[in-house]
Amino acid sequence: MSDNSQKKVIVGMSGGVDSSVSAYLLKQQGYQVEGLFMKNWEEDDNEEYCTAAEDLADAQAVCDKLGIHLHTINFAAEYWDNVFEYFLAEYKAGRTPNPDILCNKEIKFKAFLEFADEVLEADYIAMGHYVRRSFPENGEKPQMLRGLDSNKDQSYFLYTLSHEQVARSLFPVGDLEKPEVRRIAEEQGLITAKKKDSTGICFIGERKFTEFLGRYLPAQPGNIETPEGEVIGQHQGLMYHTLGQRKGLHIGGRKGGGGNEDPWFVGEKDLDRNVLIAVQGKDHPMLKSEGLLASQLHWVDREPIRDVMKCTVKTRYRQQDIPCTIIPIDDENIKVIFDEPQIAVTPGQSAVFYKDDVCLGGGIIEQRIKYSQA
């Protein structure tokens, strides 16, 4: 086994169990380990402030227990400029962005890596993400692989990473399943062992999303219509809805034509008229797409795809892999055709491509290719 004692790793400590166990495992592997806690949002109410303070206290307690130094850094300005403003602009344009992906790209593997490099003189950074990486020996580019725990795999959120960033990153829990991570934390007496996983928007936490978004973007209520143009309800703002969404339409129990009692789903957003089109039944043709067009492409090996390629794709997190064909348009744009039509393909979200366990990269869904029978 190679000697790690001369290698310094800076672990992104979030105050959660995954980063806690990552730090422990790296220490066991002989690395010089230090922690870095990022503050990426300026809280504006007591509840948020308490949560952030609790996370920092937990991160500090874990570092004290492991005997490692914890640094702190404030990236709130970078987060606002490079993540949050894009997030708002996308919602304003009627799309549904994924801020976690942008946060990884701009903050955790850019601002964090630069600070770890320039100020803390790190050889590697480490995060508590459920992904794996290859360690090639013959000058080949490292690859990013799915996490071993298929239920927790987070490669979808990391597709923007380049092979250079992968080469500088370690993912200690990527080879473990979540119950094992909690077991290790408990065995080592780490305070985060039973702490629940965080959900909600990256760094903004679990506040009420509608209320939160309404603080920054004025909502424009409008009509909910059937595809035939019948008004069947009111929406509070198109930005609060995403394609394929069932909950929150407040038109449940309403029968469609011919006494149809199937549930209603968001089938389309008509931005010009500020109208939400609702359809009945999850198999409605309007919900289906034959493929998609994607741009803002990031390939892990940084080599554009020039030839037609068979692979699989995910158009949202925790989705089953969809067999597909990538047809390059140019270096910045691709067309993707699914083997079978798919529902709820959403502009603004990311399409992430795989060959077996290897994450190839991905792009932003610009538009869906509608089902030809719709």
UniProtKB/Swiss-Prot annotation:
Residues given in the record as ATP binding sites: 12-19, 38, 128
Key words of the record: ATP-binding, Cytoplasm, Disulfide bond, Nucleotide-binding, RNA-binding, Transferase, tRNA processing, tRNA-binding
Active site: 103, 202
InterPro entries assigned: MnmA-like (IPR004506), MnmA-like_C (IPR046885), MnmA-like_central (IPR046884), MnmA-like_central_sf (IPR023382), Rossmann-like_a/b/a_fold (IPR014729)
UniProt EC number: 2.8.1.13
Chain residue ranges for the region called Interaction with tRNA: 152-154, 316-317
Site-annotated residues for Interaction with tRNA: 129, 349
Interaction with target base in tRNA, as annotated region: 98-100
Primary site of residence: cytoplasm
Disulfide partners: 103-202
Reaction it catalyzes: S-sulfanyl-L-cysteinyl-[protein] + uridine(34) in tRNA + AH2 + ATP = 2-thiouridine(34) in tRNA + L-cysteinyl-[protein] + A + AMP + diphosphate + H(+)
Keyword Coiled coil belongs to the record: no
MF terms in GO: ATP binding; tRNA binding; tRNA-uridine 2-sulfurtransferase activity
Family as reported in the entry's similarity comment: Belongs to the MnmA/TRMU family.
Free-text function comment from the UniProt entry: Catalyzes the 2-thiolation of uridine at the wobble position (U34) of tRNA, leading to the formation of s(2)U34.
Protein name: tRNA-specific 2-thiouridylase MnmA
